[in-house]
Amino acid sequence: MSERSLLVVVLAAGEGTRMASRLPKVLHRIAGRSMLHHVLETTRQAGATRVAVVIGPDREDVAAEAHRVRPDAQVFVQTERLGTAHAVLAARAALEEPADDVLVLYADTPLLRPETLENLRAPLADGAAVAVLGFRPADPTGYGRLLTQGDALVAIREEKDATPDERRVDFCNAGVMALRAREALSILTRIGNANAKGEYYLTDAVEIARADGLSAVATEAEVDEVAGVNSRLQLAEAEAILQGRLRRAAMAGGATLVAPETVFLSVDTRLGRDVLVEPNVVFGPGVTVEDDVVIHAFSHLEGAHLERGVSIGPYARLRPGTRLGEGVRIGNFVETKAALIDAGAKVNHLSYVGDAHVGSNANVGAGTITCNYDGFSKHRTEIGAGAFIGTNSSLVAPVSVGAGAYIGSGSVITDDVPADALALGRGRQAVKEGWAAALRAARGKPKV
């Protein structure tokens, strides 16, 4: 990582009309994080000293996300959308503070790797004033071309202005630019708007720098890194690219994904060695899985920690605040939330365990419900170590079941149960012999 100080200006003022959404474009999520979050995290990994985020008018939600992810971010408002250079100059106060390098990124380009940004900055330390990121798409139609002579970047030519020879160039402009800070303001403030749209284009910085006798260069990125998101289709395409990266990283780290294309990970998902993930599993944000865990098909996890040797599913749902101790078994159609389940405990079938602590080696039978909400507040359930909860039982919180206690099947438990006690909370069974035969005789054969 460079020792040079770095100001990153993130442009997040676009309207995003093609998204057809009330949510600002840059707040749409990919792999569990907003696009803006992805970009800000990349700037952190790339060694940003300061970050300035340029937003549109009345976008307090975008400002809030920027400060949530990076509390020290400076936020500036571009009151009129008059082009990319105009947007960068909206952060003029940040540009006037000391820095070695300035990096301009777009909040709707969330897949850049930090090492790509470090490579883009490197020529600035060697004397270049401007460095532009390029890529080589399979079809360059529609992109601005990067025109080079040897190692020098001569110009960025928009396709509509390009000659036939220039259009044959396949090295295209990704829009990302690094500038040496001591020349940045001088260059940016001289960009004009003498074009058809009357806008100020950042791409003009290259020719202004060269006219000043300064050096401009281009570096290259992989095509998938510079994918911009302007529509729902492109959002899905970016999701697919990032999921591919995350799946490959998980498998390289020692996890088995039986059908990788059906497993969806969040950026912060952590899978240990010899974890087995069956098909159609979704990892929401905040999931950590230790070694030797088995996650059966069609399970959904979010905000959960699974210790070594856990088995969950199929069709399990782990919600935020779930922590499963070593060797815990969570079976099919079980939902947990804000639940601490200690080592060796079992919740095998058709149960809801919320706002609860289940002690080690306890057994929670099929159809057990912790009734944690009274319409106003949540309440906790405590199940002691080695307790046995019979099937189809309701534990009405706040309530405690002592260690080693038994709850009879079908019980509704409203009072605390002492350790090693048996609690029954159901009506007594009544048997009336011959009753069914008499009913059929009185009513005749049932109609189908």
UniProtKB/Swiss-Prot annotation:
Residues bound to UDP-N-acetyl-alpha-D-glucosamine: 11-14, 25, 78, 83-84, 144, 158, 173, 230, 319, 337, 352, 363
Origin: domain of life: Bacteria
Enzyme Commission numbers on file: 2.7.7.23, 2.3.1.157
Catalytic activity: alpha-D-glucosamine 1-phosphate + acetyl-CoA = N-acetyl-alpha-D-glucosamine 1-phosphate + CoA + H(+); N-acetyl-alpha-D-glucosamine 1-phosphate + UTP + H(+) = UDP-N-acetyl-alpha-D-glucosamine + diphosphate
Subcellular location: Cytoplasm
Region listing for Linker, in residue ranges: 233-253
A Pfam family of this chain: Hexapep
Ranges for region Pyrophosphorylase: 1-232
Cofactor(s) annotated in UniProt: Mg(2+)
Example GO BP: cell wall organization
Subunit: Homotrimer.
Protein name, UniProt field: Bifunctional protein GlmU
